[in-house]
Design a protein with these regions (language model features):
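Cap/lid segment of the alpha/beta-hydrolase catalytic domain
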Residues: 118-120, 131-182, 233-234, 238-245, ...
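Catalytic-loop region of hydrolases
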Residues: 22-99, 113
Length: 413
């Protein structure tokens, strides 16, 4: 497997002493001269992979929201939301589409890698000229989630006292994140979106948009997501949190002044999460019990599947922040669209948007029952299932199926 062969970062480097900062492996080095290679080189002496002021903004624009009241009763001062747009807003302002990213995504939904964007757009198969979400017809908006680390205010951002927020950053909820996105819609002059679409954790925000702001969402697409977080999902999230906070270089969340951050903890959290993003059948078919190169697992070497997880852990380190991982994971854990609305069925039953619910048949993170609940309880909903060996990530990998499903839905809008 090409992925399994990269593996420069290892979560269990034989003989590496974790208490020695110099022993911490760096992310796998991409091709020489690529945007990713420059990012990795620049981050080699940094405790975070977050985008920071002074970095190339790429296509990002920034909305200064100011003081942001939170559901907890706290106020987040100096709030900024990073976002990107594609296409033109029609004179009637009726062609806007909001695309909401998942846990470790960002605003770069479509487009090539380049300065400010170390990776190509994460959903370019669905968004772009001539795609199902056609940027020649629609005005597409995507923001980096509040609490994230790719330009929006988060724990790695500078607090009013001039220091990074770190451990002082307040906990956020899905409703806080959606409220910030409503401020963006207001600033762009968008009263209602023709379509709000979100997958995975992005689907949490999408359903919250429709439940909390029904007049602002005409069509809704909920992909591989749920109305509330299940106990199984809470358990996986908890393990990822523990992996980060147990890293001795976490420093209780205040690691920004140190040369090394909690890279092993963040890498382990990513490896745990990535396991839930793929299916057992795919991992067995793809890797089986094959050894990684000439490594021998009998004497401490790795299986290919271990190298594969190491590779994905290392990739994340170059572009993400451990505190943001905790903040956004927390918002996933407390997600419950029915809270304060009479319960889940009542909240979903009040949604007025024409709705598409998409699930993946091999998804072991968001189970079919969650899609069934959404489709059953939302009045004007239809459900489609993606057939895939790839598990939760099937919504990204099965591009042809997703394209056909979304085109069918939008044709009736």
């Amino acid at each position: 497997s090409p992925d399994a062969a990269v593996g420069a970062f290892s979560l269990r480097t034989p003989g590496a002493g974790h208490n020695d900062p110099m022993s911490v492996s760096q992310p796998p080095a991409p091709g020489v001269g690529s945007a990713s290679a420059k990012l990795v080189d620049r981050r080699a002496g940094s405790p975070t992979g977050a985008w920071r002021p002074g970095d190339d903004p790429g296509r990002r624009r920034f909305l200064e929201i100011g003081d942001m009241p939170l559901e907890s009763g706290e106020v987040l001062p100096g709030t900024v939301l990073a976002f990107e747009t594609w296409g033109e807003l029609a004179p009637r302002r009726d062609n806007a589409v909001l695309v909401l990213h998942a846990l470790t995504g960002d605003s770069h939904v479509t487009g090539e890698a380049g300065p400010g964007h170390p990776t190509a757009g994460w959903w370019g198969t669905l968004v772009g000229p001539g795609r199902a979400i056609d940027t020649e017809r629609h005005f597409v908006v995507a923001a980096n989630i509040l609490g994230g680390c790719q330009g929006s205010t988060g724990p790695s951002s500078t607090a009013p006292d001039g220091r990074p927020w770190g451990s002082r950053f307040p906990w956020l909820t899905t409703r806080d994140q959606v409220e910030a996105e409503t401020r963006l819609a207001d600033a762009l002059g968008i009263d209602a979106f023709h379509l709000v679409i979100g997958a995975s954790l992005g689907g949490h925000r999408a359903v919250e948009w429709a439940a909390g702001h029904p007049g602002r969402v005409r069509n809704l697409a909920l992909v591989a997501t749920g109305a509330s977080t299940t106990a199984d999902q809470l358990a996986w999230c908890h393990l990822q949190e523990l992996a980060i906070v147990a890293d001795p270089y976490f420093f209780d969340g205040d690691y920004y002044s140190h040369a090394v951050g909690p890279v092993r903890g963040l890498g382990l959290a990513r490896a745990l999460a990535h396991t839930t993003y793929r299916s057992a059948a795919e991992l067995d078919a793809r890797f089986g019990r094959a050894h990684q190169g000439d490594e021998d697992p009998a004497v401490g070497g790795r299986y290919q599947v271990e190298s594969y997880l190491d590779h994905h852990a290392g990739k994340l380190l170059a572009r993400f922040d451990a505190n943001s991982y905790l903040i956004v994971t927390h918002s996933m854990m407390v997600h419950d669209v029915g809270a304060g609305r009479g319960g889940t069925e009542a909240a979903l039953g009040a949604i007025t948007a024409r709705t598409l619910v998409v699930d993946v048949d091999s998804d072991r993170l968001f189970l079919p029952g969650q899609a069934e609940q959404l489709a059953r309880c939302i009045p004007d909903a239809r459900r489609r299932t993606v057939a895939s060996l790839h598990g939760h990530d099937g919504f990204l990998i099965e591009a042809d199926q997703m394209d056909a499903i979304l085109r069918e839905f939008l044709a009736g809008a």
